[in-house]
């Protein structure tokens, strides 16, 4: 509950207590009769007297039975006889005639009896009342005299004073005009008021104390929160993760070119913009705290870079397969301009706002709104937000003690953490059999083998590695090769539960196995970052995800989308969304050209590549899906054959023995069960070099080059022809798999 809610509740309670304390509990309010009544007839008067008498008798008996030892103040109604009897009584008593006339005049102007009012009141005990009522009306005066002689009401008042209670009213009636009774005394009303006032005072004090206590806690929490934010800012500043600039107020209010995102597609778009507009001023808004960098080396080349001292790799430099060395970042920090100086730079350039996020894009007004509400207008805008790694629901909702041992793999910070754990010889479990999961498992196995590290496990639900990309037979062969490299592959399994002990995680699998691991790395794909779609009113594809764009990669006028977050239309393969490095480069470049006025359609068939250790490397293009029918043609290598470099083609390969095999698989074949995967190369097929064709309606829609490099251009040409081939072996010869 908030502080304002507590205060409102306290005020309401005090108000109700005050109303209750000042309210008087009154008896039935006497209803006055009209000022004039018709004279009562004798029959009516006699009947009324009889009913009144019996009512009083029953009430007195009830009071006597309920409180037999109490003396009460009793209100006794007048026993005035009817008119005839009154005249007789007057004559017998010797009352003058003028008094009778005066009484008759009075009876005509006012009613003889008023409900709730008493003309004659006496204070007697319950027994006296019974005796007086049983007597005749003519003897009522002696009874009253006897009651007055005994004066029990005076005794009752004296006892009430002795017990510190307030006496009855002066006329002997009970409080509120009732029939009397100790429980209805005015003293009880005063006690009730006093208790209500004390309760209200106590509630006021308690509410004030509660408000003070909660306000104090809020102040302390706000102070602690501010202190934590300051410590986090200092930590990020030391680690190089501080926002740049420190405040969004330092960002320009208007830029010609605005890019949302700081990945490969964003930087590729900047290069295209700068190539077509030499003085272009580009502002890049990134939610990361680093300059733009490439992601593929995080799961491949960086793990094969020698680092004897296990120090953090400077600039994340790595060796390519060609032997040259380069950095993970596209450009050094000196290449970029400070956002504060972007408007003053005549030659233009690119400025990166690090650590900021965009929550809304108004395509009609050409204004973007940051999370803190700061607005920036633009002329041309590109959304290149990429995608975010998925996590297993069971691990995502786990207790904090378990989450400390669970991580995803996406950024250089994840690489640093995992490399440190591997250097400490910790056991690592990788969940997933896709590109990142399989590549990372092979890289960790190589690192562990070179440094005498811990065990590397790979757990996934499918039958074998890369089962969604490779045909079933090739997927099983790849799994065998990975196990030969030192990866403990556990297919057809998933994590049922994860429990933290003192140091490790105890993983219970659905196949009955139990693993003890120091860390779990989740690599189960990613989802496009489309949080902007709702506030910005942009369309998102329901089945594929990503922002829906046209052929020019335009979501709205002057608003483009590129990279993993774009869902584009392929004239040959239909609507697609691709999560590969080459697609990010090409789509970003095309979007940048269109932002400068080119207006070119996206017709490029992007490619991808992967490396699974020193013996397996492949490239693919088009629609590479294991659920499609496939035809594979392979050449068996010699014993002395070595791995071909990814970036250069070997034309001197000596292949004394070649064998061409054609294999066609269907969707059901790709899902065939594999109970056990052997790691013995003698028992598994040996697939050296080859090409795999993926067919749809007897047309080639995808090509996978197995240990063949620098032939992607030819594969792209074959796919773009969009034709049927009678003999795919003849098509395979174009790739020179035996060269």
Curated annotation (Swiss-Prot):
Biased composition (Low complexity): 656-676
A single MF term (Gene Ontology): DNA binding
Coiled-coil blocks: none
Domain of life: Eukaryota
Protein role: Probable NADH oxidoreductase. Mitochondrial effector of cell death that plays roles in developmentally regulated cell death and normal mitochondrial function.
Enzyme class: oxidoreductase
Location of region: Disordered: 644-681
Protein name per UniProt: Putative apoptosis-inducing factor 1, mitochondrial
EC number: 1.6.99.-
Cofactor annotation: FAD
Region (FAD-dependent oxidoreductase): 257-564
Protein's UniProt keywords contain NAD: yes
Effect of gene knockout: Loss of zygotic expression results in decreased embryonic cell death and the persistence of differentiated neuronal cells along the ventral nerve cord at late embryonic stages. Embryos that do hatch undergo growth arrest at early larval stages, accompanied by mitochondrial respiratory dysfunction.
Family: Belongs to the FAD-dependent oxidoreductase family.
Transit peptide (first-last residue): 1-42
């Amino acid at each position: 509950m908030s502080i304002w809610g507590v205060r409102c509740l306290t005020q309401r309670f005090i108000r109700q207590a005050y109303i209750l304390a000042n309210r008087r509990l009154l008896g039935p309010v006497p209803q006055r009769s009209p000022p004039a009544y018709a004279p009562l007839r004798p029959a009516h008067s006699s009947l009324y007297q009889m009913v009144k008498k019996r009512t009083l008798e029953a009430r007195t008996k009830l009071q006597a039975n309920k409180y037999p030892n109490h003396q009460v103040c009793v209100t006794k109604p007048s026993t005035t006889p009817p008119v005839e009897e009154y005249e007789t009584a007057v004559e017998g008593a010797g009352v003058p005639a003028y008094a009778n006339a005066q009484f008759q005049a009075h009876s005509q102007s006012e009613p003889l009896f008023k409900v709730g009012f008493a003309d004659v009141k006496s204070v007697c005990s319950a027994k006296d009342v019974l005796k007086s009522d049983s007597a005749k009306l003519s003897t009522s005066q002696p009874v009253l005299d006897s009651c007055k002689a005994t004066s029990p009401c005076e005794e009752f008042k004296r006892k009430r004073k002795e017990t510190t209670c307030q006496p009855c009213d002066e006329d002997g009636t009970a409080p509120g005009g009732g029939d009397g009774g100790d429980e209805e005394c005015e003293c009880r009303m005063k006690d009730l008021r006093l208790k209500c006032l004390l309760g209200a005072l106590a509630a006021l004090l308690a509410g004030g104390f509660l408000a003070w206590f909660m306000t104090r806690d809020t102040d302390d929490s706000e102070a602690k929160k501010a202190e934590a934010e300051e410590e986090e800012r200092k930590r990020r500043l030391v680690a190089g993760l501080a926002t740049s600039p420190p405040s969004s107020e330092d960002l320009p209010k208007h830029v010609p070119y605005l890019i949302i995102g700081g990945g490969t597609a964003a930087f590729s778009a900047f290069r295209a913009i700068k190539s077509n507009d030499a003085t272009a001023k580009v502002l890049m808004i990134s939610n990361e705290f680093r300059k733009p960098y490439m992601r593929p080396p995080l799961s491949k080349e960086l793990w094969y870079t020698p680092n004897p001292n296990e120090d953090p790799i400077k600039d994340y430099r790595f060796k390519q397969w060609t032997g040259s060395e380069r950095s993970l970042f596209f450009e050094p920090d000196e290449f970029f301009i400070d956002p504060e100086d972007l408007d003053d730079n005549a030659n233009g350039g690119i400025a990166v706002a690090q650590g900021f996020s965009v929550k809304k894009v108004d395509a009609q007004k050409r204004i973007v709104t940051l999370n803190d509400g700061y607005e920036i207008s633009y002329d041309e805008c590109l959304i290149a937000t990429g995608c975010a790694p998925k996590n297993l629901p069971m691990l995502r909702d786990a207790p904090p003690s378990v989450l400390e041992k669970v991580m995803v793999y996406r950024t250089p910070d994840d690489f640093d953490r995992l490399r440190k754990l591997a250097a400490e010889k910790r056991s690592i479990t990788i969940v997933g059999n896709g590109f990142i999961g399989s590549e990372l498992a092979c890289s960790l196995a190589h690192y562990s083998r070179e440094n005498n590290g811990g065990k590397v496990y790979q757990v996934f639900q499918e039958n074998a590695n890369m089962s969604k990309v490779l045909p079933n037979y090739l997927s099983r062969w790849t799994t065998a090769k990975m196990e030969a490299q030192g990866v403990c592959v556990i297919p057809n399994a998933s994590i049922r539960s994860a429990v933290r002990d003192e140091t490790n995680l105890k993983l219970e699998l659905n196949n009955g196995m139990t693993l003890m691991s120091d860390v779990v790395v989740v690599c189960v794909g990613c989802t496009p970052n489309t949080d902007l779609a709702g506030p910005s009113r942009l369309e998102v594809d329901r089945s594929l995800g990503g922002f829906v764009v046209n052929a020019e990669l335009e979501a709205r006028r002057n608003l483009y989308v590129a990279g993993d977050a774009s869902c584009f239309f392929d004239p040959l393969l239909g609507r697609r969304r691709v999560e590969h490095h080459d697609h990010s480069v090409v789509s970003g470049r095309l979007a940048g050209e269109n932002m400068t006025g080119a207006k070119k359609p996206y017709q490029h068939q992007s490619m991808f590549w992967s490396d699974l250790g020193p013996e397996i490397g492949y490239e693919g293009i088009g629609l590479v899906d294991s659920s499609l029918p496939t035809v594979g043609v392979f050449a068996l290598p010699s014993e002395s054959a070595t791995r071909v470099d990814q970036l250069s083609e070997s034309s001197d390969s000596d292949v004394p023995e070649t064998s061409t095999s054609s294999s066609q698989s269907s969707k059901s074949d790709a899902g065939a069960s594999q109970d056990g995967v052997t790691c013995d190369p003698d028992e598994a097929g040996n697939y050296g070099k080859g090409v795999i064709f993926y067919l749809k309606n007897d047309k080639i829609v995808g090509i996978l080059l197995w240990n063949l490099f620098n032939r992607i251009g030819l594969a792209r040409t074959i796919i773009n022809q969009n034709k049927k081939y009678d003999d795919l072996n003849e098509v395979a010869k174009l790739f020179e798999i035996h060269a």
